[in-house]
Amino acid sequence: MQLATLLQAITPLKVDGASEMEIQGLYYDSRQVVPGGLFFALKGVAADGHRFIGSALQAGAVAVVAEDEGPVPSGVTRVIVADARHAMSRMAAAFYGNPTAHLPLVGITGTNGKTTTTYLLEAILEEAGKPTAVLGTVNYRFRERVFPAPNTTPESVDLQRTLRELADAGAQAIVMEVSSHALEQKRVDGCSFDVGVFTNLTRDHLDYHVTMDAYLASKVRLFAELLASDPVKPRRRAVVNSDDPHGPAVIAASVCPVITYGLGAGAEVTAEEVSFSVTGITGVFVTPAGRMPFRSPMLGRFNLANILAAAAAGLALELPLDAIRRGIEGHKQVPGRLERVENDRGVTLLVDYAHTGDALENVLTTIREIATDRIVTVFGCGGDRDPGKRPIMGRVAAELSDLAIVTSDNPRTEDPATIMTQIRDGIVPLGLAEYRREELPAAYAGKGFVMVESRRDAIRLAARIVRPGDIVLLAGKGHEDYQIIGTTKHHFDDREEGAAAFRELG
């Protein structure tokens, strides 16, 4: 594709050099550039892409998109833009033939519930006869093709290439988790969304966004900017959780019609006659399209919110209510979301991705509602991430568990002991017993907590001290099959470790 054609997707401030040249590929990493490539000089947190323009040119780049002016060799075209990330997103979409322009695309954003809602909506769309691709935290997938997910939402060039591949493979709809980082960094600016879904907003990622206001503002971009109707997609819709305290702000900012969901008064998509049990959720959908009974094997009030989000998104896509019901009833399990791990000790072993205070509270509240005996929670907090949530998670785990085992998560470049101490700071004011590891299980007679740095040892301790009827929750890593120590990923899967811990007991 010629550079001149790509430039029609943006409004450059200045173009120095010829634009009638063929572009062989788009690159934001100078190490990946091939001859004939177009290089985007992105300003990042750790490095400034302008420093690598020379390397890109040496590798054969014939044009550069940048925010700062600077000398370039003769024969190289320089395109100056106000925002290189936005330009890259729009030009990437053009380069790959705007794959979502004529393909239903749903973007789901929020602190918690994104992954579960994508799985549910995928099931609904499949029931409606639309082969559906999903891009999210767990993986990127379509039918039998499954790819690892390096990011919840890929960088725009990678995203548009993936979307083109999915469209060419036969996908008739795409459901995508949209992270706050992706919205802030303009990765999805080249996407043509049909529906945007807001699940909720609670404290997370403040290591990046710094304030909750900034975190909310990143989420609102989807609804305030990227859902504006156009001739290609004139019937865009926003789906918003009206139960969430931030819902009104999202509704007010939305530039398209809004469908609300929730259990509170005024929600357009809601549920009545709801019952929660160890076997799942039953109730009656109440929607603008009518009423319909439903049942789901999923557990807990927070999953009812995810079910309503998926149902509302289905209605926004004008899918039949019966297809929505069938999709929800047929969906069984999201990897690493209250996932049951079998054992022969009569213990309920659950693995969940809950890694924020709110998510952990939701999961433990659900478990408490179905528990007949003690709850033991094994959890930690990620390193090089928002430290402010650590004492919050400590307090939540200790309050809602009978025993909280504080351990390591993905410490990254932080000292695990320091992270655990910050978690402990949220527990100590509760006045609970602090056990020493060597005291357990003999001294385990009442609510308390214990610190065990090794996650593997912490899981094995939990397996040793529980009895039939107890529930063990391994929280924080969910579907992840790795642990990041320093800058290295080591294989570690809570599901595997939990199963092994119980097997070793004989």
Residue ranges and their predicted role:
Residues V62-D68, R237-S242, V378-F379, D402-N410:
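Short internal beta-strands
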Residues M1-R90, A94, P245, A267, ...:
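N-terminal leader/targeting and accessory segments in enzymes
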Residues A66-E69, V178, N200, S408, ...:
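Short secondary-structure boundary segments
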Residues L7, P71-G75, E184, V195-L349, ...:
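Acidic, Mg2+-coordinating active-site environments of NTP-dependent enzymes
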Residues A46-F52, Q185-K186, D207-A214, D386-K389, ...:
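Glycine/threonine-rich flexible loop motifs
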